[in-house]
A protein has these predicted regions:
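Outer-membrane beta-barrel porins/channels
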Residues: 14, 30, 37-53, 60-380
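N-terminal periplasmic accessory domains that precede
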Residues: 2-7
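Transmembrane beta-strand segments of Gram-negative outer membrane beta-barrel proteins
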Residues: 10-29
């Protein structure tokens, strides 16, 4: 509630504290469709060979969360949320055919959200909060040598972090039978600062090896959420939620360092998701829920990358709440996600002319994901 619409905190009586974890189990597979590299001063195309990179995701990726709300008066609520709204971690095996595109990616965000909600009357509430967000990134990929006869690759590593502040606000309406929520979360424009390390390049590029101060912007999207819930019977509720993501603010990975500015164009598009679901109270102690969602990928088909092996997604979810006692509730959920196959055509150019080498990654990506979530809520 606090993260998705703090205005709905007015539906939480007393003091409530919830702590939980999402366990993400993702898989992806890359198939080489004829990747190649150029040779400076020639029109030749040299095949880039290698293995398929193996399973790039860890077997289980835990993502914790924490929320607390307190009813201060009959009209005022205060809350705090801590979560990780965006993240990605994957690593391909040594010798991956797409190594000039990506090898290792570790992006983490941590969001701390103090919030407040105010009940205007029995039907309407407003709420909002501040998003204090930390991001940390670590990205690596191989670098092609000028001569294709050199059997070893160069290597580049970029790491950086940043703290930035955003905001969010929402409106909540209820008449006891129908709930409607509208929420807006601002985009957050990070400016990561850290280092870029280049190693392994041989003559005539060996002078480029070294560690340099570097910076890179990271623009995370603004999000608009509209949700609707209606009681069909005293025990059965239907829900629909639509979200819009302003991902078009994310243009690519632009790194500025002493060696110059490089840009890996991604050109994300605005995206959306639509979910339908229902929940049924079998008893005052036990509630069962299920739903489905279509989630449009923001990735641009013209600029796909093995660093983000993504496509449109279809979700199928189920979950339950067990009210163990008036003071404690256990929430569990499971989701399976089907990810659409996509073809990657990724040309990336390295080094100034006349030593420019363009490595073109041609791949087909496919994958899916499972998530298991559990949380414990305490009421005081």
């Amino acid at each position: 509630t606090i993260y998705f619409n703090p205005a709905a905190m007015t539906q939480l009586s007393g003091v409530q504290v919830s702590a939980g974890v999402n366990a993400l189990m993702a898989s992806a597979h890359q198939t080489n469709r004829g990747s190649y590299r150029s040779v400076p001063g020639s029109t030749a195309r040299v095949p880039v060979t290698g293995n398929d990179g193996g399973q790039p995701f860890e077997s289980v990726i835990p993502v914790p969360n924490f929320y607390a709300s307190a009813q201060v008066t009959d009209r005022l609520w205060l809350g705090l949320g801590v979560n990780a709204p965006f993240g990605l971690k994957l690593e391909y095996d040594d010798g991956f055919f797409g190594r000039y595109d990506s090898i290792y990616t570790d992006l983490k965000t941590y969001n701390i959200q103090p919030s407040a909600a105010f009940k205007l009357n029995d039907n309407f509430s407003i709420g909002g909060g501040v998003d204090v967000q930390y991001v940390k990134a670590n990205l690596t990929n191989a670098l092609p040598q000028v001569s294709p006869l050199v059997t070893t690759d160069g290597f580049t590593k970029l790491k950086g972090d940043d703290w930035t502040v955003g905001w969010n606000a929402g409106l909540f309406y209820t008449n006891g039978t129908t709930n409607v929520g509208v929420h807006y979360r601002s985009g957050i424009n990070h400016k990561l600062k850290g280092t870029q390390t280049i190693s392994g390049l041989v003559t005539p590029l060996s002078a480029a090896n070294g560690e340099f101060d570097a910076s890179a912007p990271l623009d995370l999207p603004d999000i608009v959420t509209v949700s609707f819930m209606h009681k069909l019977t005293p025990n059965l509720r239907a829900m629909i939620t639509g979200k819009w993501y302003g991902w078009s603010s994310f243009k690519g990975i632009e790194v500025t360092s002493a060696t110059g500015t490089t840009n890996k164009e991604l050109d994300y598009k605005d995206s959306y998701s639509v979910s339908l679901g229902g929940e049924y109270d079998f008893s005052p102690a036990f509630t069962l829920r299920a739903g489905t969602m279509f989630d449009r990928s923001p990735t641009n088909p013209q600029h796909l990358t093995t660093r983000v092996p993504d496509g449109d997604r279809v979700w199928l979810t189920g979950g339950a709440t067990w009210n163990i006692s008036p003071a404690f509730a256990l929430n569990v959920a499971y989701a399976h996600t089907w990810v659409e196959k996509a073809n990657i055509i990724r040309p990336d150019s390295y080094f100034p002319s006349p030593a420019t080498v363009t490595a073109t990654t041609l791949a087909q990506t496919s994958g899916n994901a499972d998530q298991v979530a559990a949380s414990l809520t305490a009421r005081f």
